[in-house]
């Protein structure tokens, strides 16, 4: 199998190309290794060797010259540095020192901690070249044999055996694709290994995802250790499904559940599927439209009792909740002190579910200590804790690759057999093994110091990007405009991450969330929100402004897609896949936007897709003209304040979400135009994208108190007509074209 991996051996030796006996023997070792199937990378330069060792993360072994290093401080430092950089991402990589007579025997004591990581010293003149090469080959083979995590290793080994397939899938390891021209194209694009490793549950040596056996069970157990969980389960169809599994395993009909209103729609689907009665936790929201934290007081027994008393569906019930769910971190990168939430809830809930879809990396850096589900302490009265991760979002895994992590409570332990009934209800009996392997690899990549270094590198890139934006501002005229960064003032220009610097202080102006609890929430440095001119965090609108939708569209035209766009802010994510080249390109394009805006260049040149969508509407319109017109529309309609209002005032509850959905399924609903929605009960959820948070849930009533929702729907339609090319997306809002134009409707319960 080691030959299939094609991991080379790196040789760093000053005589590798020299006409010396030592050089000849080093080249002889390289030749023997090549004969054994290894490829060779070689250099005479220590500096180049360090670069290769630090950037080439697919090495089988390193041989480094160390003759006389004990007495030569510079040479010793070169050897030590190479060991350090190579071991950051590959802690078990075998590294041999090459010597002739004396190597590191006389090295100072302070270097020994690094030098002891050497696999050994090979003296070029003491043994035959073939013998020395075999020492290297054995160490490399052993390293590579133990490199792959359990499920991925079993999958690679099975694929390498080239077994004939008499089971599903029908393409038979890719053979069927080669019988058709379009199939041949598919085969060439995805490659032999991808198709040969697309297997079925009929292959027993890979274990079972549904029964958690074999190498698959080993992979889940290893992931549990890495993420700090008592149990971990691999999910192959996304965290939407992972959330439903958690709820179906823990929540029954008419159970009370405490729900973050800033939640993914899969949580709302879970409420419908289980028939639970929701009590909502309302997060803060600032004037910029950035979703803030749920006040800590919302988790207290008194607050829960008040919510039960206020709910027509729960009134009279004891203040005991089956499950509470919190989105951590928020879409905008606010991370809760999970320990504080757990303590405040006390024994009020049996199950605490952290939806950490965007936060799978938190366990691997001390910056996030105590701020993620599996990082909380245990107590006798503590709840059973679940964390659901979209591993594919921020770690290295295939799309739809997710995990469920579980921490047993003091007296509440996970009943694995009962849980697995819900797991099997939602997981395919024909799992995609490539997705499973990617979960196994994602977990293995984060083990030990290698995982921390990957997160630290992401921090470094995000901080460099933040500094680059600050540097541009400093070089502009004081009265000129530039993009802002939503962050604490004290972190501008910093190149180090300290948790205390990123914690939101109560009533600080920059965040706009008021008097939040001490040490309760921090801003994640790798989620960067950029602000555009026009609106302050306090809600003050300026005369001129640049709506963020225009900037995002400009970037999209140039192949840069941001994660989320608000009225005057947009979010960019720094994952492990972001490099200096990528964020430098973003800075360059932001500078280009400024140039085009300042020059008021025609939309036809800078936003051709918008110009095409608008036709005559945009004839003669420049980029600044469009920005001014859109800003005026937001200002005249007080859009920012209206959006804050519609998310902070909850609609009236009329029936359980599951009851409303039952009526939808039975056809006991009708399409109601926006103008006639007041007083009606919604049969569907209304979810604007972005941010993807529901305005109204099935079973909730449109009333005068939530008039801002109806105003927003009307405004969104008017806005689309005024600014073609900038369509709003509201899930649940339908339209019908008639003689008098387009009519927008919402499915409501028949009365």
UniProtKB/Swiss-Prot annotation:
Catalytic activity: L-lysine + H(+) = cadaverine + CO2
Enzyme class: lyase
UniProt-recorded Gene Ontology molecular function terms: lysine decarboxylase activity
Gene inactivation effect: Loss of growth on lysine as sole carbon source. Inactivation also leads to a decrease of virulence showing the importance of LdcA involvement in polyamine homeostasis during infection of the host.
Family annotation (InterPro entries): OKR_de-COase_N, Orn/lys/arg_de-COase, Orn/Lys/Arg_deCO2ase_major_dom, Prn/Lys/Arg_de-COase_C, Prn/Lys/Arg_de-COase_C_sf, PyrdxlP-dep_Trfase, PyrdxlP-dep_Trfase_major, PyrdxlP-dep_Trfase_small
Induction note: Transcriptionally regulated by ArgR in response to arginine but not lysine showing a tight connection of lysine catabolism to the arginine regulatory network.
GO cellular component entries: cytoplasm
This enzyme's EC code(s): 4.1.1.18
Keyword line: Decarboxylase, Lyase, Pyridoxal phosphate, Virulence
PANTHER family listed in its UniProt record: BIODEGRADATIVE ARGININE DECARBOXYLASE, CONSTITUTIVE ORNITHINE DECARBOXYLASE
Entry similarity comment: Belongs to the Orn/Lys/Arg decarboxylase class-I family.
Quaternary structure annotation from Swiss-Prot or TrEMBL: Homodecamer.
Role: Plays an essential role in lysine utilization by acting as a lysine decarboxylase.
The protein's name: Lysine decarboxylase LdcA
Lineage: Bacteria, Pseudomonadati, Pseudomonadota, Gammaproteobacteria, Pseudomonadales
